[in-house]
Amino acid sequence: MADTTGRIPLWIIGTVTGILVIGLVGIFFYGSYSGLGSSL
C-alpha cells in the first residue's frame, strides 16, 4: 500500500466510480419516477 506515489490507488478509483454510478442511476430512476426522465 506504500507504492502509491504517482498513481491513484485502485480502491479510491473503485469507490469514486461506484459512488458516481450509484448517483447517476439513482438520479435517472428518480427522474423517470418523477416524470422528468422523459425530457432527458
UniProtKB/Swiss-Prot annotation:
One biological process term in Gene Ontology: photosynthesis
InterPro entries referenced in this protein's UniProt entry, alphabetically: PSII_PsbJ, PSII_PsbJ_sf
Coarse class of the protein's main subcellular location: plastid
Membrane topology of this protein: Single-pass membrane protein
Gene3D superfamilies reported for this sequence: 6.10.250.2070
Key words, A-Z: Chloroplast, Membrane, Photosynthesis, Photosystem II, Plastid, Reaction center, Thylakoid, Transmembrane, Transmembrane helix
One Pfam family hit: PsbJ
GO cellular component labels: chloroplast thylakoid membrane; photosystem II reaction center
Listed transmembrane segments: 8-28
SUPFAM superfamilies, alphabetized: Photosystem II reaction center protein J, PsbJ (SSF161021)
Location(s) in or outside the cell: Plastid, Chloroplast thylakoid membrane
Domain of life: Eukaryota
Role played: One of the components of the core complex of photosystem II (PSII). PSII is a light-driven water:plastoquinone oxidoreductase that uses light energy to abstract electrons from H(2)O, generating O(2) and a proton gradient subsequently used for ATP formation. It consists of a core antenna complex that captures photons, and an electron transfer chain that converts photonic excitation into a charge separation.
Quaternary structure and partners: PSII is composed of 1 copy each of membrane proteins PsbA, PsbB, PsbC, PsbD, PsbE, PsbF, PsbH, PsbI, PsbJ, PsbK, PsbL, PsbM, PsbT, PsbX, PsbY, PsbZ, Psb30/Ycf12, at least 3 peripheral proteins of the oxygen-evolving complex and a large number of cofactors. It forms dimeric complexes.
Entry similarity comment: Belongs to the PsbJ family.
PANTHER family: PHOTOSYSTEM II REACTION CENTER PROTEIN J
Protein name: Photosystem II reaction center protein J
